[in-house]
Amino acid sequence: GTGAALALESGVATLGNMEAIQFHPTGIFPAGILVTEGCRGDGGLLRDCDGHRFMPDVEPEKKELASRDVVSRRMEERIAQGKGVKGRFGEHLWLDITLLGEHHIKHNLREVYEICHYFLGVDPTKEWIPVRPAMHYTMGGVRTNYTGESRTLKGLFAAGEASCWDMHGFNRLGGNSVAETVVAGMIVGEFIADFCDKPENGIDIPTSLIYDAAAKVQATLDGFLHNTGNEDAAKIRARMQEIMTSKIGIFRRGEDMESAVSELEDLLKKTYNVPVKYQPGANSELTYAYRTRKMLKVALCTALGAAARKESRGAHFREDYPVRDDKHWLKRTIATWKNENDTLPTLSYENLDISKMELPPGWRGYGAKNYIDNPETPKRQAEIDALRAKMEAEGADRYAIQDAIMPFHSLLPKRLQGRNERIDEPLE
């Protein structure tokens, strides 16, 4: 989170949707290293302490192939029901891929085989893999426009997981992070080059401003180096991790999150009483303390945003507000750290414009239809259906239809505005 914290501490750049934290269902236990979604995609099964395959009981349609947030919640529910496998480091469940066969595992899931062998001493061709959901990805980041540039700080660009540019919304489908990295790097890289090539974007900053900024950073470092307080950065960070795991995790409740915000704020204040004892040379202790304060600011953006969002959406699930509320909460959370001495971020919101969506919000395709509809959704869906039917009758291809529903080609760098298909594998 250092990149997000650097942007946040500018006081100008904003962070978006920081409460949208995704947990991956199958982190090997207790190491937390992920095993790919491909295990379940290829037919792997989740089992409890009795060896029972439980996902068909709770998600009869999608089973193990439900989205990450759903599978993670179902796994934690199973453990809470007393069906977890007890071990030295806590409880876990089983991922069974033995039924896929040794050849398939060693050739198609070779990385999984090696991870289990080296980190667990487990042979997944013969043994079940101990797994439990682990924090994996954040849909939040530096709030940018489609070019990757901050909406509020000219010349600041962010791409990939460091950004919030609306590729994933409040949840991310498995396998899309590499695609985002490649696409974002390609598109945003072009826009950065274009930005630097325009004379009007030339850097015209007084030298004094640079010296002032450097002096502020040095003052922060000196604050650690010359501190005579008695707080411990390692203990502060450990407690921060405990709070985020227990109170801002897969299941969230208002009172827990409010408590988390209060305690995280206290921890942030304590970082101003952290002394750095070892000073000469490359100072890892100073780096640790410096980053811990930044982590706490990012954690506060996450916790406060989660506490304020009174609904469940994607990876953000509240037990006290289990319904997705498109009528009141179809909006992005924006976090700003306005003043250097603030101990909490300032939140604001951006409403989403349904009239510009290619896929207006609706039923996710599994479970009960427990969401509050936005009154604009039926209208937009009717517009899309009518436009699609008209253009299909006129013989338009899917590229033209998509561009008519949600124009985007003109927004891309000119070099990338052609059809996106492999030469030897045309999509039509």
Model-identified regions with their sequence ranges:
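Structural beta-strand/beta-sheet cores of well-ordered domains, especially the beta-sheet scaffolds
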Residues: 11, 19, 42-44, 91-93, ...
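Beta-strand segments within the central parallel beta-sheet cores of soluble alpha/beta enzyme folds
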Residues: 17-24, 129-130, 202-211
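Glycine- and aromatic-enriched mobile tails/lids
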Residues: 47-70, 75, 84, 137-139, ...
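Accessory "access/gating" subregions that flank catalytic or transport cores
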Residues: 100, 104-147, 151-154
